[in-house]
From Swiss-Prot:
Keywords: DNA-binding, Isopeptide bond, Nucleus, Phosphoprotein, Transcription, Transcription regulation, Ubl conjugation. One of its GO terms (biological process) is bone development. GO terms for cellular component: nucleus. Residues 1-24, 37-80, 152-185, 220-242, 435-483, 495-612, 628-672, 708-736, 769-854, 877-907 are annotated as: Disordered. This is HMG box transcription factor BBX. Pfam families: DUF2028, HMG_box. Residues 80-148 bind DNA.
Length: 907
């Protein structure tokens, strides 16, 4: 509840400062950043509330600012909070009381209660506050002669620009940043094609990257697919850049099918993004084939592509000199393979069916796979060796073919070829392997064998993680939205997560495996592949690692590029310096991951409610420094929110703080504010004087308002449970009394339900009194102050601010909660009387409709049946738990929940 308070403060704070908004996420969100200014106002409903909120907001602006910031050039006048009016003074004076009674109540709810009280005050009583306000305003204007009454926007003069501009700058940045990358050949030619540039991740909030990824995945899949084909040379650079940046690029490009070969270096994540986007784009030609082929095949292909890409990346990086030639050759191979792959996929599936049954053959096949890998490695080597001229030609071919979705896979397959060295690829991607082999070097039969083996492996892997199949299917169902989801998940699981949080990938493994077979292998490939392989291939790994070394150059480089693949090459081989840091953590993580992955994959065919990557991305961002942990803010808010109790408020009234504390901000915040304000507000003296006077203002006890409520038909909300309860009864005051005391009884049951604090006898006694002596308010008993987390937890017993007012509206304190109580009242009224009063039942039931109907005419309109049902269920539980004697006549009748403190105001 205090959250709303906090939000307002932060938002305005962000406005005011532009420097340290409390909730940075708002700043990062491109849309929210602009709307920040509007939020606080949207929430204000009443004028009084608006005034209070404005004051609070204004206070918040300055309070949280660092002293240094507060002392900048701007005159204090611009920062000065507008002087409080009489009502605000009243609120400031009494908010602590409300807080005492309703520790869980948010600031707005408290203000509503205060507004009720204020309305009840006699003009004489109000006069003191009015005078004080006038005095203060005069003094304030003297102290701040240049002060101008701002429009209701609450924003200090400089506020909007700082928050918004940084964002604009960031966005303006992007086009250049991509060009800055030293992408020797294609990058420059192709970069201009990019639809948009990514902001430099170092200067950009992590969340914005996600947003961008989503936007671009949704908005520019086709255009970007064609546009972006970063060069191979570019990819190494990309790799050097943070994975986050790569991710951003990936999302921006929404990867182009051909891009994979070049981008493979960028990162598995990048590849994955490409794959997912390409799948969505492929929608036309290949998707059909792929869907037909089977989720498995697609999955394998994607995995292979991603892993192959990774491996290629490493290899390409290692042999940068020959990189262009190799890749291009690979690309040529890709196109050829693309056709082959389509053919082979069907054959592979048939064979898959044959081999799927025997997982036993996997071990043997693993050996075969090794051989195949070696062959493939040889092929790859050959490809690398090929002339750069060919390479140049091939890129052109690739570009030509890039238009065809088929080639996105073929491209990935090319990549995979070099990547094949790692068993993971084989395991994960039966098809990919086939693709990997050069059509020229490997005969189709060989490919088929490999495919069979891979299929078996896949099956094996799928046995472990059946979700894979489903995942693939999901991809085949490809939609832009899904691709976006994949991208984001990829990010969460991605290289980036891998680099930063070894753990993140684990968490993410399940989701990735769940929907994104490609992701499974592609980004987490480092980890996920590893995990799969570890399980599947650890048996084989011992052999494989040994044998894979012959192709060591490739396998090792691949393993280096894919830390997650450590099991194969990495275990035995040193990592490249850049990746050294990552792999060490990965192996350990990968192992736990193995079990996690499989477990998750089994459970998570499609991502149900279970989230394996809870906060992984967030953690990654935080660990990277892209995000500031929100925990500090939350904790601060909680700490302060709990402190809204009287002690804090009253203690805090001292000095200038009163001006800022009005909002009922928690004590800790108040103290900070005091210190800061002391330092920077020239009007400190004014505040001090005002503080003294302010403290001299009368502080009326809630009981006072209760009495007034009784005498005045106007609804008065009590702060105490008792007072609030009494106000509840008082809502109906005079007019309802005519309805009979039954009305009280009908209401009381529900009220009892809401106020559970008091002993059962008390309510009964009070009810009797109320009936007999309708006009005597019950003394309000203050709740004991809550400590620690209790302050933050809503207790059913504490929902005392949900009181129906004389007009039958729930008093505003609770907001929507109030409305529910009304419904609860309506529902419970009939039930309670029927259930608990034998003879009086008929009366109460008759009366209830009256009371509830008049009191809550529109309640039903506000709530859905489901909500009502929920309320009813809760009430039933309460009834079962507590029964208090209340009678229509004042005789004890069983009422649910003793704590009904009804000061018989409802007459």
């Amino acid at each position: 509840m205090k959250g709303s308070n906090r939000n307002k403060d932060h938002s305005t704070e962000g406005e005011g400062d532009g420097k340290r908004p409390k909730r940075k996420c708002l700043q990062w969100h491109p849309l929210l950043a602009k709307k920040l200014l509007d939020f606080s106002e949207e929430e204000e409903e009443d004028e009084e509330e608006e005034d209070i909120d404005k004051v609070q907001l204004l206070e918040a602006d300055g309070l949280e600012q660092d002293v240094a910031e507060t002392e900048d050039d701007e005159s204090p006048e611009q920062r000065a909070r507008r002087p409080m009016n009489a009502f605000l003074l009243f609120c400031k004076r009494h908010r602590s009381l409300v807080r005492q009674e309703h520790p869980r109540l948010d600031n707005r709810g408290a203000t509503k209660i205060l507004a009720d009280w204020w309305a009840v005050l006699d003009p004489k009583e109000k006069q003191k506050y009015t005078d004080m306000a006038k005095e203060y305003k005069d003094a304030f204007m003297k102290a701040n002669p240049g002060y101008r009454w701002c429009p209701t926007t609450n924003k200090p003069v400089k506020s909007p620009t700082p928050t918004v501009n940084p964002r604009k700058k960031l966005w303006a940045f992007p086009p250049d940043s991509s060009r800055d990358l030293p992408t020797p050949k294609k990058a420059k030619t192709e970069v201009p094609q990019l639809n948009f540039g990514m902001a430099d991740p170092t200067q950009m909030g992590g969340l914005s990257m996600l947003l961008l990824a989503g936007e671009h995945a949704l908005g520019t899949p086709e255009a970007s697919s064609g546009t972006c084909r970063p060069d191979i040379s570019e990819s190494p650079e990309l790799r050097q850049k943070s994975p986050l940046f790569q991710f951003a690029e990936i999302s921006s490009r929404t990867s182009h099918p051909d891009a994979p070969s070049k981008q493979c270096q960028a990162s598995a994540l990048f590849q994955f993004a490409e794959i997912s986007s390409s799948t969505s784009q492929l929608g036309g030609t290949e998707p059909v084939k792929r869907c037909g082929n089977s989720a498995l095949f697609q999955l394998a292909e994607m995995c292979l592509a991603s892993e192959g890409v990774k491996m290629e990346d490493t290899k390409l990086i290692k042999s940068k000199e020959s990189d262009g030639g190799r890749i291009e050759e690979i690309e040529k191979g890709k196109e050829e393979r693309g056709t082959e792959v389509e053919k082979t996929t069907e054959t592979s599936f048939q064979k898959e069916a044959e081999f799927g049954k025997s997982a036993k053959g996997n071990v043997r096949e693993s050996k075969d796979l090794r051989d195949i890998e070696q062959l493939q490695m040889d092929n790859v080597m050959a490809i690398k060796v090929e002339d750069p001229k060919e390479i140049r030609k091939e890129p052109e071919d690739d570009q030509k073919y890039s238009h065809f979705p088929d080639f996105s896979y073929s491209a990935s397959s090319k990549i995979i070829i070099s990547g094949v060295p790692s068993r993971k690829d084989h395991m994960c991607h039966p098809h990919g392997i086939m693709i990997i082999e050069d059509p020229t070097t490997l005969n189709k039969p060989e490919k088929i064998k490999k495919k069979k083996k891979k299929n078996k492996l896949d099956r094996h892997g799928n046995d472990k993680s059946t979700p894979k199949k489903t995942c693939k299917k999901r991809q085949s169902s490809e939609s832009d939205i899904e691709s976006v989801m994949y991208t984001i998940e990829a990010v969460a699981k991605g290289d980036w997560g891998v680099d930063k949080l070894g753990e993140t990938p684990r968490k993410k493994v399940r989701p990735s495996s769940s929907g994104k077979g490609g992701i499974l292998d592609a980004k987490p490939p480092k980890k996920k592949v590893k995990s799969k392989e570890k399980k599947v291939s650890k048996e084989k790994c011992s052999d494989i690692t040994k044998e894979s070394r012959p192709p060591d150059f490739l396998s090792i480089s691949a393993s280096k590029s894919v830390p997650g693949e450590v099991p194969e090459g990495i275990k035995a081989e040193p990592l490249t310096p850049t990746e050294d840091a990552l792999p060490p953590s990965l192996p350990g993580q990968a192992k736990p991951e193995d079990s996690d992955c499989h477990r998750k994959t089994e459970t998570c065919g499609s991502r149900k409610s279970e989230r394996s990557c809870k906060g992984a991305l967030y953690k990654t961002l935080v660990s990277e420094g892209m995000l500031t942990s929100l925990r500090a803010n939350v904790d601060r808010g909680k700490r302060s929110s709990g402190k809204g109790n009287s002690s804090d408020h009253e203690g805090c009234w001292s000095e200038e703080s009163w001006t800022f504390n009005q909002s009922g901000t928690s004590g800790s915040k108040k103290f900070k504010k005091k210190l800061r304000e002391d330092s920077f507000l020239g009007s400190a003296k004014l505040d001090e004087e005002f503080e003294k006077k302010f403290n001299s203002l009368p502080q009326y006890s809630p009981i006072t308002f209760d009495r007034k409520c009784v005498s005045t038909p106007r609804k008065k909300k009590k702060t105490g449970n008792m007072s609030s309860e009494s106000t509840k009864t008082s809502k109906g005051s005079g007019d309802k009394w005519s309805h009979k005391q039954f009305f009280l009884d009908a209401i009381h049951p529900t009220e009892a339900i809401f106020s559970e604090d008091k002993s059962t006898t008390e309510p009964a006694f009070k009810v009797k009194n109320a009936l007999s002596i309708p006009n005597t308010p019950e003394p309000t008993t203050m709740q004991e102050p809550l400590v620690g987390s209790q302050k933050r937890k809503a207790r059913k017993t504490k929902i005392t601010h949900l009181v129906r007012t004389a007009d039958g509206r729930v008093s505003p304190a609770g907001g929507t909660l109030d409305d529910k109580p009304k419904e609860q009242l309506q529902r419970s009224l009939p039930k309670v009387p029927g259930t608990y009063c034998g003879d009086n039942c008929s009366h109460s039931t008759v009366e209830e409709p009256r009371s509830s109907t008049p009191d809550m005419p529109a309640v039903s309109a506000f709530f859905s049946l489901a909500a009502l049902a929920e309320v009813a269920a809760m009430e039933n539980v309460h009834r079962g738990q507590r029964s208090t004697p209340l009678t229509h006549d004042g005789q004890p009748k069983e009422m649910p929940q003793a704590p009904v403190l009804i000061s018989c105001a409802d007459q």
